[in-house]
């Protein structure tokens, strides 16, 4: 495993802290964590690397109202480009 997902309850809901590297092989676990109806934000400050599939999953969840906190600039740019091309 090259990543870690920690869950932190807040008064607004659950915040997921993702650290390490997320790849296609990790998507099922990440998707399951994001499907928890109480997730309000994903903390990305410790995220080192993601692939395109993981970026798309984060973009979809952001579009559905989940906040991406401290999103690394390269991921933010990637999400923006992906949305603009759709």
Ranges and model annotations:
Residues 1-14:
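Short beta-strand/loop segment at the start of cytosolic alpha/beta domains
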Residues 15-86:
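Amphipathic alpha-helical interaction surfaces in cytosolic regulatory modules
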């Amino acid at each position: 495993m090259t990543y870690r997902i920690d869950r932190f309850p807040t008064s607004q809901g659950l915040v997921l802290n993702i650290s390490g590297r997320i790849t296609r092989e990790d998507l099922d676990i990440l998707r399951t964590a994001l499907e928890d109806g109480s997730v309000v934000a994903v903390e990305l400050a410790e995220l080192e690397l993601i692939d395109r599939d993981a970026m798309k999953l984060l973009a979809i969840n952001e579009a559905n109202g989940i906040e991406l906190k401290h999103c690394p600039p390269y991921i933010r740019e990637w999400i923006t480009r992906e949305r603009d091309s759709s």
